[in-house]
């Protein structure tokens, strides 16, 4: 690993917008280092001088699973091995579509969605744990979950399955880490219904195309969506505390 000093370092997927972007900005404002991953660029780069070089952006498509080990290696090479007090991995990126009955979804669509929303977080976590096991720093993985991981919905089979998988994966890894010399903390955090691009995608579907489109529109029109910034603030509190991974942590929990 590198020689750059710093207190806390966070690897965050999906920092180009939504919760990932807000979380990165709040952590940077606290003086932390952030390594953002997204398929495209990031607005954070435009204000990189404001962050005193503490934001690094990596453009990468998480659907490309075979390169994730090297991705984590490249990022960890920039993080100090001795000076870092905390290293975190926030698996935030996810793909909502396809929003159709499963018999109307192609193999390519199913594969891409599951790769980004489930397989990538698993591989990122595996590589992160393996490559930081020699460190004494506190380590934590946060997996962004969803109510869809617990409640089945028509035309959302792929997304619901990916989030259910994230929840179970989190609990399994927590059990694996129990009793380790420097265990990695891991939690699944359900942010609730948030005003993000995923919500906009769901609202943009016709009722014929997506049966729940009306419900998503109603939630938006009645002002029930939470802002990404509010969710990011609450998530930072969960990052700081030592949490129980035996259940999904909901944003409404005190």
Predicted regions: what is each one?
Residues 16-17:
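Conserved glycine-rich cofactor-binding loop
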Residues 30-46:
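Conserved glycine-rich Rossmann-like NAD(P)H-binding loop of the short-chain dehydrogenase/reductase
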Residues 50-66:
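Rossmann-fold cofactor-recognition segment
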Residues 85, 95-111, 130, 155:
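Conserved mid-core segment of classical short-chain dehydrogenase/reductases
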Residues 103-122, 166:
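Catalytic Tyr-X3-Lys loop
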Residues 125, 162:
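Active-site helix of classical SDR
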Residues 146:
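Residue(s) in the substrate-gating loop at a strand-loop-helix junction
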Residues 184, 188-191, 196, 204-254:
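C-terminal helical subdomain
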């Amino acid at each position: 690993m590198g020689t750059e000093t710093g207190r806390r370092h966070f690897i965050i997927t999906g920092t180009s917008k939504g919760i990932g972007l807000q979380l990165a900005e709040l952590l940077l404002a606290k003086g932390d280092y952030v390594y953002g991953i997204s398929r495209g660029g990031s607005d954070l780069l435009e204000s990189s001088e404001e962050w005193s070089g503490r934001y690094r952006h990596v453009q990468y498509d998480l659907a490309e699973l075979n390169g994730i080990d090297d991705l984590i290696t490249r990022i960890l090479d920039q993080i100090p091995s001795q000076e870092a007090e905390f290293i975190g991995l926030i698996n935030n990126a996810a793909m909502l579509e396809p929003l159709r009955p499963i018999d109307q979804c192609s193999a390519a669509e199913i594969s891409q969605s599951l790769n980004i929303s489930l397989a990538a977080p698993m591989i990122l976590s595996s590589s992160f744990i393996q490559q930081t096991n020699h460190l004494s720093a506190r380590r934590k993985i946060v997996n962004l979950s969803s109510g869809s991981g617990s409640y089945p919905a028509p035309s959302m089979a792929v997304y619901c399955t990916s989030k259910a998988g994230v929840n179970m994966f989190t609990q399994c890894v927590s059990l694996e880490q129990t009793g380790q010399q420097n265990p990695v903390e891991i939690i699944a955090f359900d942010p609730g219904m948030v005003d993000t691009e995923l919500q906009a995608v769901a609202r943009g579907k016709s009722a014929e195309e997506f049966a729940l489109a009306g419900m998503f529109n109603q939630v938006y029109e009645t002002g029930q969506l939470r802002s990404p910034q509010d969710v990011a603030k609450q998530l930072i509190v969960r990052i700081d505390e030592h949490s129980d991974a035996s259940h999904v942590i909901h944003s409404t929990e005190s």
